[in-house]
Amino acid sequence: MAEKHGSLSINSENIFPIIKKWLYSDHDIFARELISNGCDAITKLKKLDVMGEYTLPDDYKAEVQVIVNPEEKTLKFIDTGLGMTADEVEEYITQIAFSGATEFLSKYKDKTTDDQIIGHFGLGFYSAFMVADEVHIDTLSYKEGAAPVHWTCDGGTEYDMQEGNKTTVGTEITLFLNDESTEFSNEYRMREIIEKYCSFMPVNIYLSKENAPQEYETIDEAELRDDDVIVERIHEDAKTEEKENDKGEKEVVEVSPAKDKVKINKRPVSLSDPEPLWMKHPNSCTDEEYKEFYRKVFMDYKEPLFWIHLNMDYPFNLKGILYFPKINTEYDSIEGTIKLYNNQVFIADNIKEVIPEFLLLLKGVIDCPDLPLNVSRSALQNDGFVKKISEYITKKVADKLTGMCKTDRESYEKYWDDISPFIKYGCIKDSKFSDKMNDYILFKNIDGKYLTLKDCIEENRKPEDETKTEETVESTEEKKEDGAKDEKEPEKTTIFYVTDEVQQSQYINMFREAKKDAVILKHNIDSAFISHLEQKDQTIQFKRIDADLTEELRGEEAADEETSKTLTEVFRDALKNDKLEVKVENLKNEKVAAMMTLSEESRRMQDMMKMYNMYGMDPSMFGGQETLVLNAKHPLVQFIADNKDSEKTPVICEELYDLAMLSHKQLSPEEMTRFVQRSNEILLMLTK
């Protein structure tokens, strides 16, 4: 072919600086684009073979080689695809590929940094100029009689094309890296990039260093493959040892048979898995394969609890695997990773515009070839197709969880402590998910039994509630007909909960003795979750176990008013707090001398203050302080009432107050110091 010198149709000097500006944080995507081009070329060649338009050689290998050369600062991408003729190079490289880059640029020019293009797909071949001063292409088409082509361009407006010397079908792209991009001639850096973007591309990808010393390995001759390069044949004689037999006689025994081995050039190891687990049918995958895939992709050696294999072909193509990771404690941060792929090519992690936000607490991969890529994040948010994908994923997750609860309740309960933060967050964020999961949310009670929300309501409903149900309905209907306005709200069913089983053990024991139940809610998300449930069903309310005294904890007789007045004055004087709230009750549990209560409204307001770092503000501004509840039946309380002028009384009051507070919340460092010192003083008093 005649040598040709040509000009690109558009001034590339204006394009490449802008491309580099937009992709400065993702400039490693050039490798993904060039490897993807090679994979596409291989796929097309294999398709031609299937169609009978080309016959692949018997020794054909579908592969992309990436070769680094740090000394020369070059990087090569070699594929065994269908190659190009001179006319095709002219068409695809200087026209179509360039117009693709131009179209790519047009999508970016009006975008802000807050509205990035998803995945940066479509730049293709011209992404090479992000890192290279000069690019060479050597290619040979599969077409009979085609001549090899050599094409060069320095990123400016002109290119040169002439006949090349490539002898095998395929394409080789050589990048002469610029000074800012020499990192990409480092073998370890390129391995990192390939593993990031191309770990699951549908062809084998090999990475090597040019002019590196040849490495070797030794294998059994039986393991020899046709493509192995034999360096040396090795015969190992049988190994023997002299041993004593049963008769005490020494004899020579063979401990290892003779072996024929071969020394071969070290086999290259593919950096990609052309058949990732998510592309297989779920019925053909074993539990061990799922676990191994999880370890490999997420570098997490704690086994996942369980997983969901997504496999849908209509109305859109979507495959993937979602894993529920094990969380060690309620204090673990829940940081999931959902990797999004397009035709086995990695796009990005955790794209919340495609994947429901609450699912990002899980770990998994989702591959959706139908997903629009060259669009902005804001466009995805309003894309009806993407919304359907999101809804489908949510439905499959809900179906898996509800199905497990119905058919394998034992496993569901076993996993609950780990999966509950995810489910609760999902219910808060997604109303449809909440509706599906409403009957399958579990609460562990103080005896370790798991209850549904319906169970909790039934256990805590007052006996008279059931008898009044029909009357309430009739009364409501009558009032509606009469146009009555000031209706009294029906009494809510209260579900009590515990946030710290150790600290609140005194309250738990009181509840057990009174045959009252409470559920354990100690995760950070539980506060928001119970608020969500209360908004959804306004006939229920949640109260912490120390929020109030229930009727079941009180005795039948009310405390003496005069005694109550005396004790209030004594405690306020002893604690030097004239605003202290004191309530005297006859508690059924005579072992409890004092306890603290704080209304649920005040607690939640204080929790909100902590959440928003509103420290230093007086909690009483937002709903009041704790109330000290004294048990009039307890001997210590009776002693204080009868001996208000004793010198021991102030010390006993202070000690009782701190003991009650310890069962309610942590003391401050200063309060704890005073408590320990006072306790020591009381012990000394006992020795005298």
What is each of the regions a protein language model found here?
Residues 1-179, 183-185, 192, 199, ...:
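GHKL (Bergerat-fold) ATPase N-terminal catalytic module, capturing the glycine-rich phosphate-binding loop
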Residues 117, 135-158, 178-182, 188-688:
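GHKL/Bergerat-fold ATPase module in large chromosome/replication-associated machines
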